[in-house]
Amino acid sequence: MNLILSAAAGYNWSQLEIFVKSLRKVYKEKVLLILNKPNIELIKKLKDFNIDFLDTKIIPSDSYQSRYQYYFDYLNNNKIYQKVLLTDSRDVFFQNDPFNFPYKKDLNFFLEDDYIKNSSVNIKWIKRTTGKLILEKIKGKKISCCGQVIGSYQNILDYCDMMRKNIIIYKYKPSIHSFLFNRKIKGWDQGIHNYLVYSDIFKNIDFYDNESGDVATLSLKKGLNFNNKGRLINANGNEYSIVHQYDHFIDSFKSLIYKISN
């Protein structure tokens, strides 16, 4: 049995509808969401689509970082899965079963269309967590997005273990301005993620870019290609199983989203 695991605390049904409906059109196995006090409508809809959830104390504003602890705890106590996908939810939809892609390695990461050195936000996330020396070492690498990670059960468990531990070790150090104005910095787990994936800590790993991979990571993508069915395809003409950050091209996906919703 495979598992799709996502932290979706703070979201309502309207924010998760596309994720859930598109997923259940292509995948029938276990899905688990990490939530915090879901409302009645969301609970009912998740039940209708056979989506399981854990009602936890996860804080929505901190869920980018704290989700790995919840992932680890659940996986460590449920050693029944073969493959696991960790995924974002609000800005994700599915075109095919993500476990059907012929991955050759046990842990797989997905690249954005630019380098760390060209992204001020990724530079900040790395420099203010792991520090300048790590940034200098990996800034020439392509940005690896932490919103999608797929692999074998044990390798995903090990990944979550390393993420939760290093998020504590390399806690984000805000600027004086952010500290004084109490600004919440989201997403800095990606700084830890890039440090880990480029530090030879994980074994038997692979990286996939938007050109040939099964996951479309769109925030930095310049243009989109669709097949005659209106589905997003990569440079090889293959449909992506997962489309992430589609809200960056929301007008291009209106007809596809309409089909999913109805």
Predicted regions and their residues:
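N-terminal anchoring/stem segment of glycosyltransferases
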Residues: 1-82, 154
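Membrane-proximal basic amphipathic "stem/tether" segments
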Residues: 1, 129-131, 250-262
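Catalytic core and acceptor-binding pocket of nucleotide-sugar-dependent glycosyltransferases
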Residues: 138-253
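A structural signal for short, well-ordered beta-strand segments and their strand-loop junctions
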Residues: 32-34, 83-88, 93-94, 108-110, ...
